[in-house]
């Protein structure tokens, strides 16, 4: 028999590409014989195939392209997934999770057997997102740039709903894949020979013991900040005309990025551990003009950052992740004459900011807190619109994103101005405790 916990984790990782409820057999009657498993997997595929909803398209006027860029060799190389305004809307064929090792990494993160990762890659490794792979960049204007930092156990590809949404409104978004071993999986090439034959060196998530958690997480957030700055430097080098080599051998012509980025309009954005990375990197790199921290994990944030972070900062929190202690730490960033905003999305959970909220079925998504009470599309739409309004103000954009200025103030039926604890009628439950290894 398969334990109930394993079935639940299996459902989580299945990431059904359409929101479609279906019924699992009672665990006591579960048969693990290969012939029976084959028929059960067939039924799962059939259930998924009859659905209709997945990662949303951007709501802006620009077609969206996507590519991967890697500069240099070894584990200090720069690795980003780039979302950008495209010349034309080609096939929406960007693979969501492109290598089976990422599924293996997710199984490590969740503590399940590696065979689960293999099965999930077989079933869902071809799931695509609504962006055109290697489509030519739309030329003729300079774009603002957003560097994005992923959460613990995540990687560069699973924030496509945010990346695509922002790119469809005229941003270039570079999602960094971190090499601090906070990603479920990542890879690099040791040298040019390895890159030529695609001999990848894989790094998997580091399991951190409780007694070493504080020191390790603070080291990781510092490395993550350096990696965000390093990614920014590499992209700006290309913008200045430096002919860098993409060691991935992509068909995307990087020369298109020359003179395509307005380096006075650069922001930093991140989710959870990536939100903590936003706070760290802003304090160290003034090229980032402002930051958006999505439900930041405050555990690794050093107190010295409170007064060192000078740029405007927007916190967008979920309703059920933060503790009063976490909110108190965020409010210590409220310094005199410094722009600080905080809003909370009602009925949301921590995973409402990443793609898993869209690609998991309704029943499983709600049971495993991948979905909140709020519709996932409404939550991500509020996130993107509030972010764009904030970015327009502080990057000096000549757009119409100011129509969403009320969202930055929490003026919407689905928003709370300030923290979850500022709503008299809402008492949020805690998903995790500070310092937990399941934080994201």
Curated annotation (Swiss-Prot):
The keyword Signal applies. It catalyses: a 1-O-alkyl-2-acetyl-sn-glycero-3-phosphocholine + H2O = a 1-O-alkyl-sn-glycero-3-phosphocholine + acetate + H(+); 1-O-decyl-2-acetyl-sn-glycero-3-phosphocholine + H2O = 1-O-decyl-sn-glycero-3-phosphocholine + acetate + H(+); 1-O-dodecyl-2-acetyl-sn-glycero-3-phosphocholine + H2O = 1-O-dodecyl-sn-glycero-3-phosphocholine + acetate + H(+); 1-O-tetradecyl-2-acetyl-sn-glycero-3-phosphocholine + H2O = 1-O-tetradecyl-sn-glycero-3-phosphocholine + acetate + H(+). Keywords: Glycoprotein, HDL, Hydrolase, Lipid degradation, Lipid metabolism, Phospholipid degradation, Phospholipid metabolism, Secreted, Signal. GO terms for cellular component: high-density lipoprotein particle; low-density lipoprotein particle. It comes from the Eukaryota. Its EC number is 3.1.1.47. The active site is at 272 (nucleophile), 295 (charge relay system), 350 (charge relay system). It is found in: Secreted, Extracellular space. Transmembrane segments: none annotated. Residues 1-21 form the signal peptide. GO terms for biological process: inflammatory response; lipid oxidation; low-density lipoprotein particle remodeling; phosphatidylcholine catabolic process; plasma lipoprotein particle oxidation; platelet activating factor catabolic process; platelet activating factor metabolic process; positive regulation of monocyte chemotaxis. Disruption phenotype: Mutant mice show increased susceptibility to neonatal necrotizing enterocolitis in response to formula feeding, bacterial colonization, and asphyxia/ cold stress. One of its GO terms (molecular function) is phospholipid binding. Gene3D superfamilies: alpha/beta hydrolase. Glycans are attached at residues 59, 75, 199. Lipoprotein-associated calcium-independent phospholipase A2 involved in phospholipid catabolism during inflammatory and oxidative stress response. At the lipid-aqueous interface, hydrolyzes the ester bond of fatty acyl group attached at sn-2 position of phospholipids (phospholipase A2 activity). Specifically targets phospholipids with a short-chain fatty acyl group at sn-2 position. Can hydrolyze phospholipids with long fatty acyl chains, only if they carry oxidized functional groups. Belongs to the AB hydrolase superfamily. Lipase family. This is Platelet-activating factor acetylhydrolase. The lineage of its organism: Eukaryota, Metazoa, Chordata, Craniata, Vertebrata. The gene is Pla2g7.
């Amino acid at each position: 028999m398969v334990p109930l916990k394993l079935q639940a984790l299996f459902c989580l990782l299945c990431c059904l590409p359409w929101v479609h409820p279906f019924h699992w057999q009672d665990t006591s009657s579960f048969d693990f014989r290969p012939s029976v498993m084959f028929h059960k997997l067939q039924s799962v595929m059939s259930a998924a195939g009859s659905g209709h909803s997945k990662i949303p398209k951007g709501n802006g006027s620009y077609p969206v392209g996507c590519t991967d860029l890697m500069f240099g060799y070894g584990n200090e190389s720069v690795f980003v997934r780039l979302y950008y305004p495209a010349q034309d809307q080609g096939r929406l064929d960007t693979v969501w999770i492109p290598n089976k090792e990422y599924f293996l990494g997710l199984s490590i993160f969740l503590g399940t057997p590696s065979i689960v990762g293999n099965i999930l890659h077989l079933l869902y490794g071809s799931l695509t997102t609504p962006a055109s792979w290697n489509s030519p960049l739309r030329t003729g204007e300079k774009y603002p740039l957003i560097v994005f930092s992923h959460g613990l156990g995540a990687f560069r590809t699973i924030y496509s709903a945010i990346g695509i949404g922002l790119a469809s409104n005229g941003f270039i978004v570079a999602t960094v894949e971190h090499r601090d071993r906070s990603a479920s999986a990542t890879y690099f090439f040791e040298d040019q020979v390895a890159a030529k034959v695609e001999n990848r060196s894989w790094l998997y998530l580091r399991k951190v013991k409780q007694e070493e958690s504080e020191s390790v997480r603070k080291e990781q957030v510092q490395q993550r900040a350096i990696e965000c700055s390093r990614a920014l430097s590499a992209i700006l080098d290309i913008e200045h005309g430096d002919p860098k080599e993409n060691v991935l051998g992509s068909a995307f012509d990087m020369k298109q990025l020359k003179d395509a980025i307005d380096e006075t309009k650069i922001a930093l954005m991140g989710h959870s551990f990536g939100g903590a990375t936003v706070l760290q990197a802003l304090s160290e790199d003034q090229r980032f003009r402002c930051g958006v921290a999505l439900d930041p994990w405050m555990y690794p944030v050093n107190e010295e950052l409170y007064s060192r972070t000078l740029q405007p900062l927007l916190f967008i929190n979920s309703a059920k992740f933060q503790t009063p202690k976490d909110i108190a730490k965020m409010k210590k960033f409220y310094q005199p004459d410094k722009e600080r905003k905080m809003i909370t999305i009602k009925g949301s959970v921590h995973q409402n900011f990443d793609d898993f909220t869209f690609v998991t079925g309704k029943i499983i998504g709600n049971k495993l807190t991948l979905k909140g009470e709020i519709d996932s599309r409404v939550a991500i739409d509020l996130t993107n619109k509030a972010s764009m309004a904030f970015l327009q103000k502080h990057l000096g954009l000549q757009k119409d994103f100011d129509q969403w200025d009320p969202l930055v103030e929490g003026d919407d039926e689905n928003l709370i101005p300030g923290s979850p604890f500022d709503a008299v009628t809402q008492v949020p439950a805690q998903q995790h405790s500070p310092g937990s290894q399941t934080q994201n």
